Structure formats: structure tokens, C-alpha cells
Amino acid sequence: MTDIDPHIWGPSFWSTYHLYASSYPIHPTPIIMDAARSFVKTIPFTLPCSSCTDHAFAYIKNIQKQDPDLISIVSSKMLFEKFFIDFHNSVNYRLGKPLLPESVARKKWRF
């Protein structure tokens, strides 16, 4: 894999993730939950950075240990939004960046 600097693509990816979460239905149907589950599982494959890919796989796998079907992520809009905020903050923490307050995320991406 050719690593591309996350400063180039990271902000766009985060905006995509958070905007997807902001448009997620309050009460998703089973089909929408399946699509969201697939989206989350696909995230590591879309990252053009090997350490980012490794982190995403580990983060998602850790959730799947307790929740193999990711119900705790996809069963409601609030949980889906929270997943992406928590995921974003796990990356920020790993990189020594400031954490993203939920209130800031909600204002920026209009949750």
C-alpha cells in the first residue's frame, strides 16, 4: 500500500463520516442498518494509510468482541453519531490532537 499523508485526505473523510451520521434516520429500518453496518466494516479498506487502516481494523474489531453485529452502532441515529465522534476521538488521542467535543461535532455537522 502506498501511504498518503492523512493531512491530505483526513478532513474530507471525517466530514463524510460525520455527515453520513447526521443524515442517519432516528429509527433506521433493517435494510438501512445493514447498509450502515457494511459501511462501518468497510472503513479500514478505504483508508490510504497503513497505520490508519490498522487502527480502524483494531477499533472496529474491539467493538465486535462485545457486539458482533454492531447493533450498538447502527440501531439509532444517536448511537451512529456517537460511534463516529468516538472513533474520531480515538484517532485524535492516538495522534496527540485535541479531542472533538460532542457539542462541537453536533454544531459543525448539524446533528
Curated annotation (Swiss-Prot):
Disulfide bonds join 49-52. It catalyses: 2 R'C(R)SH + O2 = R'C(R)S-S(R)CR' + H2O2. InterPro entries: ALR/ERV, ERV/ALR_sulphydryl_oxid_sf, ERV/ALR_sulphydryl_oxidase. It is an enzyme of class 1 (oxidoreductase). It holds the Pfam family Evr1_Alr. Its cofactor is FAD. Its EC number is 1.8.3.2. The keyword Ribonucleoprotein does not apply. Belongs to the IIV-6 347L family. This is Putative FAD-linked sulfhydryl oxidase 347L.
